[in-house]
Amino acid sequence: MVTTGPVNSDDDVGKVTWTYGTVEVRVRVPAGRGLWPAVWMLPLDHESRPEIDILEVIGQDPGRMMMHFHPSDRDDDSPNKDYRLTGKNLAEGWHTVRLDWQPERLTWFLDGKQVWHLTGSQVPDEPMYLVLNLAVGGVYPGPPDETTKLPATFEIDGVRITKNEPQ
C-alpha cells in the first residue's frame, strides 16, 4: 500500500499566497521508478490556471531536474516552456531550489546558482500558492517496480517565502 498527498499553502488553516517574491525550499528527493517529487505553484483563482514548476524529478532519473512554466489555459497560442538540468544527482544529499518571481520575469536557482530564467508578459501577475508533493505512479513517472525502495520519502527541511509586492 502507498499513501501520499500534497502539502500546500492554500488550505483552510491559513492561506499563504503572494504575487511576486521569492520561494526557497530545501529538499532531499527520493530515487526510484515511479516516484515524482515536485515543488510547484498554482493560482489562487483556479480559473486562469498558469502553473510554475520550481522542481520536478522523476525518481528513476534523479540526476535530471525539470523546471516548467505552463501559461494560462485561456491562452492557447502560448506553448509550455521547460528546462532540464542534468549532472547533479538530487537524491544525494540536501539541495536548495529557489524561484525569484518578478513582474514579467521568473528565475530558477539550484544550490545558489541561477540555472534558468524566463521573461515576458505571460509571467503570472496574480496571487499564487505553493504545493509540495510526492506523486507515486501514473503515466509520467510510470509505476513503481521491484527496484523502487518503499517506503520512500520526499524530505523538506524548510520553506522560505518572501513577498515582494511591486510599488
Where are these regions (language model features)?
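GH16 jelly-roll
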Residues: 1-167
